[in-house]
Amino acid sequence: MFPLIILISFSFTFLSASATSGAGEGVANLSTCLINHNVHNFSMYPTSRNYFNLLDFSLQNLRFAASNMPKPTVIILPNSKEELVSTILCCRQTSYEIRVRCGGHSYEGTSSVSFDGSPFVIIDLMKLDDVSVDLDSETAWAQGGATIGQIYYAIAKASDVHAFSAGSGPTVGSGGHISGGGFGLLSRKFGVAADSVVDALLIDADGRLLDRKAMGEDVFWAIRGGGGGNWGIIYAWKIRLVKVPKIVTTFKISKPGSKQYVAPLLYKWQIVAPNLADDFTLGVQMIPIDLPADMKYGNPTPIEICPQFNGLYLGPKTEAVSILNEAFPELNVKNDDAKEMTWIESALFFSDLDNIFGNSSDDISHLKERYLGVKICFKGKSDYVKTPFSMDGIMTALVEHEKNPNAFLVFDPYGGAMDKISAQAIAFPHRKGNLFAIQYYAQWNEEDDAKSNEHIEWIRGFYNKMAPFVSSSPRGAYVNYLDMDLGMNMDDDYLLRNASSRYSSSVDAVERARAWGEKYFLNNYDRLVKAKTKIDPLNVFRHEQSIPPTLGSTQEHNYSSE
């Protein structure tokens, strides 16, 4: 079988940045180019009436919707792969930076804003959201603009014994989620979402549509967990479906109480959860609790912290309850705490859509919704834990969490399949040796934006205080919880855009990006740089934490394998 390389007919000459004599001329040139190549679904700033509706529709983090944030010159919504290719090439012809948006959930807004001062456009993939399921091969093709919820729904309509291992957020775009790995409730059984990718269609900076064979194994390896916005645009993923029983068991058990009450539960959880059979996922999150003082402390046992233990078992309720009561009797799980349902109903159950749709929340078609109408400002950070927390570490986490009653603290258990898949199998590296991952998550309403610095400083302080208890050298992080505090590409991007200076600056850019690249990708960072240099040597697809290319060699850094 020959590799798939499709070149869409397109006649133009690439222009340098100096070839456009001004912003107005640049916009006119881009508009003309798009229209001449049958791309009509776009909105220009500030003249189009629906510009801000399109900008905000998929912008999930309202930190980046503020009026002082950089705005794209044009928002383009391609309707086909031909339009997507033409869009990429028109943007290159007119020297606009490209931001690619699937679901708009980037923790640092990289799919919707650009901070380096250059004019940019958003290529929004929301119109490219088809999902085609083939039960004979037990695979599905999902276009890059499809959300996780749309993929789940399409699979469930085709089969009640097939699933896809990915995250719990139904509106999250598959393009970015899978590109960063994609951990979820089935990951202890089947690995992350990117582990299930068997082929892909990638459009590169030259407008070539490349399948796995055409892009080569180095690039195919990189797009599976190496982070979004780096390699080109994923037009479609081919994913392997996994088999699940017709009935699974779920539960959410809250154990509110004092820090002294909660700490032993968390201590036991970290011993139990990573060592359960891989059919069982038992996560825990500290959910917001903001009670008046008389309710908080007016009981014999103060209610200071509320951990919620979330469980999914690929089997019947009787087995799930028996397993937990033997391994974790302190939870005191009752039969009434657990619910039997189908896998797709469990996806709905853990999506928290009941908070939005109320009594109709059991309708699985809600998983297809792209717009839920509920948006907030948020900031996230992440960690990996390799050795069990001491009680001092747990109390540190609880004390810091209590300082922000609207925040979440999420512990995701590893082990199971995550221990069995090599750290080098795909670009996502966080495997054997990790007990659990942590997500720190501060949230606030848009009307409270004046206090955003307080929330951000809180989460930074929390993160700093947890340093003695988490992984180190490097301190691991999850690229899907993008965190600009780890460092940013800025000045070197200007140099990398200019071919004449790229040779002298590329090694510096690679070493600068190592500061966060090795936190996200550990020993896989240098291989990602090589893949980037192969597929996008001119750094067309970039953002503030993207992988830089180089034409020179880099020093290899070796750390203990995860």
Curated annotation (Swiss-Prot):
EC numbers for this chain: 1.1.1.-
**GO cellular component terms, A-Z:** plant-type vacuole
InterPro entries per UniProt:
BBE, FAD-bd_PCMH, FAD-bd_PCMH-like_sf, FAD-bd_PCMH_sub1, FAD-bd_PCMH_sub2, Oxid_FAD_bind_N
Q: Name where it's found.
A: Vacuole
Q: What is its main location?
A: other
Expression (tissue specificity): Mostly expressed in roots.
Q: Which Pfam families match?
A: BBE, FAD_binding_4
Q: Where is the FAD-binding PCMH-type domain?
A: 68-244
Q: Which UniProt keywords apply?
A: Alkaloid metabolism, Disulfide bond, FAD, Flavoprotein, Glycoprotein, Oxidoreductase, Signal, Vacuole
> Is Signal one of the keywords?
yes
The secretion signal range is 1-19
Q: Which residues are glycosylated?
A: 29, 41, 359, 498, 558
Pros-8alpha-FAD histidine PTM positions read 105
Q: In which pathway does it act?
A: Alkaloid biosynthesis; nicotine biosynthesis
Disulfide pairs here are 33-90
PANTHER family recorded for this chain?
OS08G0158400 PROTEIN (PTHR32448)
Question: What protein family is recorded?
Answer: Belongs to the oxygen-dependent FAD-linked oxidoreductase family.
Its protein name is Berberine bridge enzyme-like C-1
Q: Which organism is it from?
A: Nicotiana tabacum
